[in-house]
A protein has these predicted regions:
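Extracellular beta-strand elements of beta-rich domains used
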Residues: 1-3, 77, 193-197
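Extracellular glycan-recognition surfaces and repeat-rich motifs
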Residues: 7-11, 16-48
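Secretory/extracellular carbohydrate-interaction modules
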Residues: 41-117, 200-202
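Beta-strand-rich interaction surfaces with strong enrichment in secreted/lumenal proteins
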Residues: 61-67, 119-126, 167-169, 180-182
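Short tryptophan-centered beta-strand motifs in secreted/extracellular beta-sheet-rich domains
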Residues: 75-77, 129-142, 146-152
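Extended, low-complexity, turn-rich repeat/linker tracts enriched in Gly/Pro/Ser/Thr and Asp/Glu
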Residues: 81-86, 140-144, 186
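Short, aromatic/His-centered strand-loop micro-motif at the edge of beta-sheets
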Residues: 112-137
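Flexible glycan-contacting loops in extracellular carbohydrate-active proteins
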Residues: 159-191
Length: 205
C-alpha cells in the first residue's frame, strides 16, 4: 500500500510517561486497547489488569473471559481505583448477564441488567488507592426466579459472613459468560487482579 499523502503525525501520550505493559489474553473479548497488564500499585511488583485512560473513546470497558453458556458460578476479584474522594472510577464484574459494580463517586454497590429495566443498589463506602475484594454469584430456582448476591470488603480483612446486596429477579438469567467491567469518566485508572471463577457448589459462603 502506498500513497502520495504525508503520514499522519504521531500523537503523544500526554497522560503518563512511557510505561511497560503486556496485552491481556487474546481470547478475552474486546480487552485489548481498553485494558493492559501492568505493574500494580502497592502490590510489591506483581502484575495486574489496568483500565487505560489515554483514549477517551474507550472510557467504558466491558470484556468477557469465558463461554456464553456458563452458569452456576461464583466470580470474584481484587479491585482498586486511583483518584481522590471526589474523583473515582467504577469497577465491576459480570456474572450470568448481571453487572455488579462498585461505583466510586456515588459510593454504591450496584446490581443491574439491561440498565434501566433492572437496577438495584446499596450504599457502600470505599476509598481510592485501596484494594478491595468483590464477589458475586447468581442462584436460579426451579421456577425460573433467581437471586443475585454480591459482597465487597477491604482486601486483607476477613470476608463478611453476609452479602452486601441481594436482589431477587422474577425471571432470572439462566446463563452468561463471566466478564469484567470498568468505567473511567474522570481519567482515574482502575485495576483488577486475582480473578477467580469457580462452580457455586465449591465456592465458600
Amino acid at each position: 500500500l502506498s500513497t502520495d499523502a504525508p503520514p499522519a503525525p504521531a500523537v503523544p501520550n500526554t497522560f503518563e510517561p512511557p510505561t511497560a505493559f503486556a496485552y491481556p489474553p487474546l481470547a478475552w473479548n474486546a480487552a485489548r486497547f481498553r485494558f493492559e497488564v501492568r505493574q500494580a500499585p502497592g502490590e510489591g511488583g506483581t502484575k495486574a489488569l489496568c483500565k487505560t485512560i489515554e483514549n477517551k473513546l474507550f472510557q467504558r470497558g466491558q470484556i468477557f473471559i469465558g463461554r456464553p453458556g456458563s452458569k452456576n458460578y461464583t466470580l470474584e476479584m481484587d479491585v482498586l481505583t486511583e483518584g481522590n474522594k471526589r474523583k473515582m472510577s467504577e469497577i465491576g464484574l459480570i456474572n450470568q448477564r448481571y453487572l455488579v459494580v462498585l461505583k466510586g463517586n456515588s459510593q454504591q454497590l450496584e446490581v443491574s441488567s439491561n440498565q434501566e429495566r433492572f437496577r438495584e443498589s446499596v450504599p457502600f463506602a470505599w476509598v481510592p488507592n485501596q484494594w478491595y475484594r468483590l464477589k458475586a454469584r447468581v442462584d436460579v430456582a426451579a421456577d425460573g426466579s433467581g437471586s443475585v448476591k454480591a459482597k465487597a470488603w477491604k482486601k486483607g480483612e476477613e470476608e463478611p459472613a453476609v452479602w452486601t446486596i441481594e436482589v431477587a429477579h422474577k425471571h432470572a438469567h439462566t446463563e452468561g459468560a463471566p466478564g469484567l467491567f470498568s468505567f473511567t469518566p474522570q481519567e482515574q485508572r482502575a485495576w483488577i487482579d486475582n480473578i477467580s471463577v469457580v462452580p457455586n457448589n465449591t465456592a465458600t459462603r
